[in-house]
Swiss-Prot record:
Name the record gives this protein: Deoxyuridine 5'-triphosphate nucleotidohydrolase
Family as reported in the entry's similarity comment: Belongs to the dUTPase family.
SUPFAM superfamilies noted in UniProt: dUTPase-like
Disulfide bonds, paired cysteine numbers: none
Gene3D superfamilies assigned: 2.70.40.10
Originating organism: Klebsiella pneumoniae (strain 342)
EC primary class: hydrolase
Reactions accelerated catalytically: dUTP + H2O = dUMP + diphosphate + H(+)
CDD domains on file: trimeric_dUTPase
InterPro entries: dUTPase, dUTPase-like, dUTPase-like_sf, dUTPase_trimeric
């Protein structure tokens, strides 16, 4: 079942010059977000910048959130990833979707107007309430943390 999410177009080029986010295939999890820029932006090695998408969403359902994730090709081929690694969009947020990009590569990268820069995935949310305890029931793992199970 397709969930309906309210979206506002903040830049008139979205839906005209720049396509609205859509799923590329019936099995796609993410919707591509585009850089809603007037001019190309040069992202120097090590630099970060905040890019507008021209869209605002209001999820409204507290059992849902959206995450903004990098596009694998930009990171692998060009070293361009999200500046905050993952963006979290809460259900009650109503502002413009902005994407923080970071060039961790060795070469400058040019971001063109309308270029696909990130992807957005809707995820279920469970809000939890903490139950204060003095001790936990014992488990096989216990406090075993990073690397406790080995590499093979």
């Amino acid at each position: 079942m397709m969930k309906k999410i309210d979206v506002k177009i903040l830049d008139p080029r979205v839906g005209q010059q720049f396509p609205l986010p859509t799923y590329a295939t019936s099995g796609s999890a993410g919707l591509d977000l585009r850089a809603c820029l007037d001019d190309a932006v040069e992202l120097a090695p090590g630099a970060t910048t905040l890019l507008p998408t021209g869209l605002a969403i209001h999820i409204a359902d507290p059992s849902l959130a959206a995450v903004i994730l990098p596009r694998s090709g930009l990171g692998h081929k060009h070293g361009v990833v999200l500046g905050n690694l993952v963006g979290l969009i809460d259900s009650d947020y109503q502002g413009q979707l902005m994407v923080s990009v970071w060039n961790r590569g060795q070469q400058s990268f040019i971001i063109e107007p309308g270029e696909r820069i990130a992807q957005m995935v809707f995820v279920p949310v469970v809000q939890a309430e903490f139950n204060l305890v003095e001790e936990f029931d014992a488990t096989d793992r216990g406090e075993g943390g990073f690397g406790h199970s080995g590499r093979k």
